[in-house]
Every structure is written in structure tokens, then in C-alpha cells.
Amino acid sequence: VRARAGMFLSFQTPEEIPGITLENFLRTAQNAITGKPVKVFAFRKELAQQMEALGMDPAYADRYLNVGFSGGEKKKSEILQLLMLKPKLALLDETDSGLDVDAVKTVAQGVKAYHNETNALIIITHNAKILEGLKVDYVHVLDDAHIVRTGGDELVNEIIEEGFHAVKEDEAK
């Protein structure tokens, strides 16, 4: 229902789904969203291109969804889903958690490839690095369930340079 409405949710800890390959999951989801069967050749071509852009081994398309994937592979799998399903609204819950520096860059590139004027993106993160290079409209810094600071690109840069702690301290002054 949410997917048909154009919504996508990325989980902090993606579930493993044995018995359904990544390719079959994505093709079935696209069929459900569009209401018509996707053309297999075109689908596989786009899937291969998106997987290559994310540095994913093409063999992952034939593996069960997230089963035996490392943490980084699960996050890339979710970004692949984002790119293939093209939702109108995406909520990414700590999609960068537990990733090494290179994987954060790859995930950030995937997020950047998705984001444009026709969709909305909400990113929950403890690491502002994933926001680098994205054109953000708003940044809200939360502390103890309260918004302590709001800004735009300038706030992203401030957080990257000084950290969340410094940004929260500035607000307390």
C-alpha cells in the first residue's frame, strides 16, 4: 500500500527474507507499483546499471533478499531498492550506520542519484557526511526528542566541521 502511494522506508537494520531473490523482489514491487508487468529485458538492464553504480556484484540479484549480506551490502541493497522503485517520498533511517568511509560515499552517491525536485527525502543520521553534496532544503538537529537547531546547507557544513555537539552547545548559549 505504501509503495503504491509512492513511499519508501529504509530500515536501520534491514530484514533478511529467505526464498525471495533480490531481483524477484524488485520486479514484483515494480509490477505492484505500476499495476502492469515490467519488461524483463529493460528491467534487468536497469538493475545491472544501478548495481554497477553502487559497486554491487551482479550475483547479488540472484541471492535471497539480504540473506547473508554484510551490513554494508544490506544498506546498498536498500539504496538499490530506492533507485529501482523511484518513490515520491523516501525515509532513510540511519542508512549510513555501521558503514566504512567508502561505503558511506557509495550510499551517498546513490541517495544523490535518487534525489531531485520531484521527490522528497527525509534522512535520519548521526553522521552528516552522508549529506555532503546533497541539496538540502532543511536540516533539523534533534536532541532529547526536541529540535534544537534548524538550518540549511550552511548547517550541514557547520556540523561536518564542528560536530553535532558544538552545534547543540551553540544553541544552548
Predicted regions and their residues:
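Hydrophobic residue in the Walker B motif beta-strand
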Residues: 90-92
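ABC-family P-loop ATPase nucleotide-binding domains
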Residues: 15-88
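Walker B catalytic motif
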Residues: 94-95, 102
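Conserved beta-strand-loop-alpha-helix hinge in the C-terminal portion
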Residues: 2, 133, 138, 142, ...
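ABC ATPase NBD coupling module
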Residues: 1-8, 114, 159
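H-loop/switch region of ABC-family ATPase nucleotide-binding domains
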Residues: 125-127
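Conserved D-loop-proximal element of ABC-family nucleotide-binding domains
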Residues: 100-105, 150
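Helical segment within the ABC ATPase nucleotide-binding domain
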Residues: 104-117
